Amino acid sequence: MNSAVSEAALIGIDWGTSSLRAFLIGPDGEVLEAVSSTRGIMSVEDGNFDAVFHDLIRPWISQKTLPIIASGMITSRNGWVETPYVQVPSGVSDLAAALVSFETSSGINVRFVTGMTTDHNGAPDIMRGEETQIIGATAAGLGDGTYVLPGTHSKWILVENNRIVDYSTYMTGEIYGALRSHTILRTLMEEGSFNEEGFRRGVTSGLAAGINLLHELFHVRTLPLFGKISGDMVADYLSGMLIGVELKAASEAFGKDSAITIIGRGDLADRYELGLELAGLSCRKAPENIVARGHFLIAKSAGILS
């Protein structure tokens, strides 16, 4: 048995739309090992989640029986086991009480974290996976305040007394993909490395756009047409504009008084950090793998760990 497995207390699984991560978690919530895959729920053929699950963590479960907690879109209608939603405000104890147990083909018991839901003027909002990351952030000492989780559907989440009290979803990433690939703007997009000047100009435009967004979007076509921006700036100008609109709306809804915590990885988190700075808002980045801390805290609250 390898030393990491012998020390482990828990396996945490973060299974989203486009990616899959698993963590071997120690007795104090530390990540001992991690593995990842591109087998998000939308790339699993014929709903064969059981096989993907076993393939990913077989080196661990073949050596030791460990409790397993899974979160993310794997609990959605398109996932492995659909779980209900808990209503905000909610915290770690609510999620722990609502865990859904499921037995795999090999007899392993997996506990799935439920999603969360809220209501804005009669329209529901939902999330799956982000709640576990927020629990991990509070365990990491990041505490109360506003969090942004960039992605295809960005989440802005308000935390008070270590409980999620409100949140909103913004379809920024998906709108960007649709505009870039399925509108007249697609003919202007050039592949290349990140163009910071184009992004900065786009954010500035987005922050000022307000209700004029549909008009401002046409400038993504006309600015390069008249040589106001170069071709290699267009994609990042569009990205910046949409992120700027999101930052303006969300910061007004959730407040600007304290530092906004960014939970995310790589280029997209960097873009939001730059965008927030351009908007005059203070921000900080959460440490990596905080979702594993969330798995650990939920498991502990549920009495799964001693």
Which residues fall in each region the model found?
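Short glycine-aspartate micro-motif
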Residues: 10-14, 67-69, 145-149, 261-262
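A short acidic Gly-Thr/Ser loop motif
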Residues: 13-19, 73, 149-153, 172, ...
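Adenine-nucleotide phosphate-binding core of ATP-dependent small-molecule kinases
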Residues: 206-247
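Glycine-rich phosphate-binding/hydrolytic loop that grips phosphoryl groups
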Residues: 281-306
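Short glycine-rich, Thr/Ser-proximal phosphate-binding strand/loop in the N-terminal lobe
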Residues: 10-48
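Glycine-rich phosphate-binding loops at beta-strand->alpha-helix junctions
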Residues: 19, 257-275
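Short beta-strand-loop/turn "lid" adjacent to the catalytic site in phosphate-handling enzymes
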Residues: 60-127, 161
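Glycine-rich phosphate-binding loop plus the immediately following alpha-helix
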Residues: 44-45, 116-206
